[in-house]
């Protein structure tokens, strides 16, 4: 079994190719929505500036309002398209993984002493494969958005107001840095939770199959107590993972709120002439655009933080699969189609056939 977590990350990377075009749609649709978001915020700020500062009548503002509504509808459509495509890609990848694992199980000899128990193998194929679902459907699109959109938004804002641009570019990296620190502890807790889930699933399945034997030997109460103990261990490990997730999300929200509050404070103090850091007056149009974009710069990072533990869950699931069934095949082995032979039947004659048990202690057929 591979002990290095980097190998698990490489395997997740290789599995992406099985997502097909749907995965590309899931990755690119949110980026297109981010580009439209800038256009929408700029148009909304322009409409507000014209209405408040310019005093233009509502009839002249209706084209801008219509454009804003149209952009909202298109962005909602792109969001739904990306989400559905992510689910389709994840299902395709899980199907490929299960085919590969079934192939590995069929290739194993029934006499293999190292083979996993049937309950553990079933848990690996069902539960642990399911653990990669949200990695491809949610985490990967969120990671791409977090890597690109804040930088693009910051680059757009920087020429308009260098103070706001610098504030964004300084505060935004604090969130990924903290996520990396939290991720170390989260990965360990998630690995333990995956092992506890696999142990409980395998134990319950095996005991269920041997229920009659357990009752005959009067062991049903002892095994029930053992399953209760395993369930309690899983509950504690799951709560540990959830506590780390909630704590990290709270701290990340704190950093994001500080960034948004800093922009709001800067814009407000500039408007009332308490700050004079700009070379030119701050217009209402630009000020509203900065306020509208402030939460949007942190949204991709917050989205990544909310799905960051899906990455740890996927890695833990792959490690558990490897521990129970061995290294995952990159591609399932395609079994050739077996067509019935045409023509006359073939006869086979065996003389003096002897058949013994594998330990050669008993003779089943002698000299037939």
Task: Write out the residue ranges for each language-model feature.
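Primarily ABC-family ATPase nucleotide-binding module
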Residues: 325-368
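Membrane-integrated ABC transporters
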Residues: 1-36, 61-63, 86, 131, ...
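Cytosolic ends of transmembrane helices, especially the final helix of ABC transmembrane type-1 domains
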Residues: 219, 243-246, 295-324
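An intracellular "coupling" helix at the cytosolic face of ABC transporter transmembrane type-1 domains
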Residues: 15-20, 110, 127-136, 140, ...
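Hydrophobic alpha-helical segments in the permease module
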Residues: 64-79, 249, 281-306
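Juxtamembrane helix-loop junctions of ABC transporter transmembrane domains
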Residues: 4, 40, 44, 71-114, ...
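Transmembrane helix-loop-helix hairpins at lipid-water interfaces of multipass membrane proteins
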Residues: 17-78, 163, 274-281
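Transmembrane helices of ABC transporter permease
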Residues: 18, 22, 26-32, 142-192, ...
């Amino acid at each position: 079994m591979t002990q290095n977590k980097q190998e698990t990350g490489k395997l997740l990377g290789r599995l992406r190719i099985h997502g097909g075009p749907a995965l590309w749609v899931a990755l690119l649709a949110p980026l297109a929505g981010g580009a439209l978001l800038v256009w929408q915020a700029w148009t909304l700020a322009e409409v507000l500036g014209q209405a408040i500062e310019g005093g233009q009548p509502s009839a002249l503002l209706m084209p801008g309002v219509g454009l804003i509504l149209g952009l909202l509808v298109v962005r909602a459509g792109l969001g739904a398209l990306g989400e559905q495509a992510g689910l389709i890609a994840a299902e395709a990848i899980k199907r490929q993984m299960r085919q590969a694992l079934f192939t590995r199980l069929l290739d194993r000899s029934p006499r293999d002493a190292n083979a996993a128990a049937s309950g553990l193998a079933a848990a690996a194929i069902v539960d642990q494969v399911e653990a990669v679902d949200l990695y491809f459907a949610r985490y990967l699109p969120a990671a791409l958005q977090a890597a690109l959109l804040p930088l693009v938004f910051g680059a757009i804002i920087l020429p308009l107001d260098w103070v706001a641009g610098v504030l964004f570019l300084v505060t935004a990296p604090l969130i990924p840095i903290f996520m990396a620190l939290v991720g170390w502890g989260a990965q360990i807790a998630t690995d333990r939770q995956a092992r506890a889930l696999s142990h409980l699933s395998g134990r319950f399945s095996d005991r269920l199959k041997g229920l009659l034997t357990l009752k005959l030997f009067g062991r049903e109460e002892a095994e029930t107590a053992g399953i209760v103990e395993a369930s309690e261990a899983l509950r504690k490990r799951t709560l540990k993972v959830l506590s780390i997730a909630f704590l990290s999300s709270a701290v990340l929200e704190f950093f994001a709120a500080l960034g948004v509050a800093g922009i709001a404070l800067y814009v407000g103090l500039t408007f009332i002439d308490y700050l004079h850091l700009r070379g030119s007056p701050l217009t209402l149009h630009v000020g509203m655009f900065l306020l509208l974009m402030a939460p949007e710069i942190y949204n991709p990072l917050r989205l990544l933080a909310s799905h960051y533990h899906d990455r740890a869950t996927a890695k833990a699931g792959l490690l558990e699969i490897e521990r129970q069934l061995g290294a995952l095949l990159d591609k399932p082995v395609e079994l050739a189609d077996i067509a019935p032979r045409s023509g006359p039947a073939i006869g086979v004659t065996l003389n003096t056939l002897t058949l013994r048990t594998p330990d050669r202690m008993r003779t089943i057929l002698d000299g037939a």
